């Protein structure tokens, strides 16, 4: 059975993609065939191949499967704003059915699928749909990325409570040092470990420049997630 996880963050710009790449690397190092999925992305750039989003490209690069870009990122928008706003402006509605169809396709190929959301837990995708709604519909275990900075404790606890109130399992959380560690950094981490009702998967240190190929998976320990910690190398599979 395919392992599936949904990555959300305490806010936007907290390093969800960096953490997602690290998670994919760690799962690959454990021997799993992996696929990263960024179903909705904004702030994309036009290339000769069409609109491309840097976060989605990073997930594509760190997947062990050879994935087509469209399989990783079915909805991509140029304007760097909330998805529900830009999709409405362009007349391109984001449909839950399309998100789920893309997930089914990856599940059919990969053993370990990581879905990265956009923004925070309640990011709206339309007037009637949020990322939280879709993750709940899919019953995806959640991994929370905490951008360690002033205010993160409150944001992290509120997000964790919202995930649990949706009936989903908070599978683990990652501390991502989005600013150079301050004087009370150790106390922040200790408080988060005490207050968050989920396993601590590791801390990604302050990294000024992180490329998609950067080796960052070693910062995380997936053993608390369960079966993803064991080696399960699969046979070669075709590109999606």
From Swiss-Prot:
<keyword id="KW-0963">Cytoplasm</keyword>
<feature type="binding site">
    <location>
        <position position="17"/>
    </location>
    <ligand>
        <name>Mg(2+)</name>
    </ligand>
</feature>
<comment type="pathway">
    <text>Cofactor biosynthesis; biotin biosynthesis; biotin from 7,8-diaminononanoate: step 1/2.</text>
</comment>
<feature type="binding site">
    <location>
        <begin position="116"/>
        <end position="119"/>
    </location>
    <ligand>
        <name>ATP</name>
    </ligand>
</feature>
<keyword id="KW-0093">Biotin biosynthesis</keyword>
<dbReference type="GO" id="GO:0004141">
    <property type="term" value="F:dethiobiotin synthase activity"/>
</dbReference>
<feature type="binding site">
    <location>
        <begin position="205"/>
        <end position="207"/>
    </location>
    <ligand>
        <name>ATP</name>
    </ligand>
</feature>
<dbReference type="GO" id="GO:0000287">
    <property type="term" value="F:magnesium ion binding"/>
</dbReference>
<dbReference type="InterPro" id="IPR004472">
    <property type="entry name" value="DTB_synth_BioD"/>
</dbReference>
<feature type="active site">
    <location>
        <position position="38"/>
    </location>
</feature>
<protein>
    <recommendedName>
        <fullName>ATP-dependent dethiobiotin synthetase BioD</fullName>
        <ecNumber>6.3.3.3</ecNumber>
    </recommendedName>
</protein>
<dbReference type="GO" id="GO:0005829">
    <property type="term" value="C:cytosol"/>
</dbReference>
<feature type="binding site">
    <location>
        <position position="55"/>
    </location>
    <ligand>
        <name>Mg(2+)</name>
    </ligand>
</feature>
<keyword id="KW-0460">Magnesium</keyword>
<keyword id="KW-0436">Ligase</keyword>
<comment type="similarity">
    <text>Belongs to the dethiobiotin synthetase family.</text>
</comment>
<keyword id="KW-0479">Metal-binding</keyword>
<feature type="binding site">
    <location>
        <position position="55"/>
    </location>
    <ligand>
        <name>ATP</name>
    </ligand>
</feature>
<dbReference type="GO" id="GO:0005524">
    <property type="term" value="F:ATP binding"/>
</dbReference>
<feature type="binding site">
    <location>
        <position position="116"/>
    </location>
    <ligand>
        <name>Mg(2+)</name>
    </ligand>
</feature>
<feature type="binding site">
    <location>
        <position position="42"/>
    </location>
    <ligand>
        <name>substrate</name>
    </ligand>
</feature>
<comment type="function">
    <text>Catalyzes a mechanistically unusual reaction, the ATP-dependent insertion of CO2 between the N7 and N8 nitrogen atoms of 7,8-diaminopelargonic acid (DAPA, also called 7,8-diammoniononanoate) to form a ureido ring.</text>
</comment>
<keyword id="KW-0547">Nucleotide-binding</keyword>
<feature type="binding site">
    <location>
        <begin position="13"/>
        <end position="18"/>
    </location>
    <ligand>
        <name>ATP</name>
    </ligand>
</feature>
<dbReference type="GO" id="GO:0009102">
    <property type="term" value="P:biotin biosynthetic process"/>
</dbReference>
<dbReference type="Pfam" id="PF13500">
    <property type="entry name" value="AAA_26"/>
</dbReference>
<dbReference type="InterPro" id="IPR027417">
    <property type="entry name" value="P-loop_NTPase"/>
</dbReference>
<keyword id="KW-0067">ATP-binding</keyword>
<comment type="subunit">
    <text>Homodimer.</text>
</comment>
<feature type="binding site">
    <location>
        <begin position="176"/>
        <end position="177"/>
    </location>
    <ligand>
        <name>ATP</name>
    </ligand>
</feature>
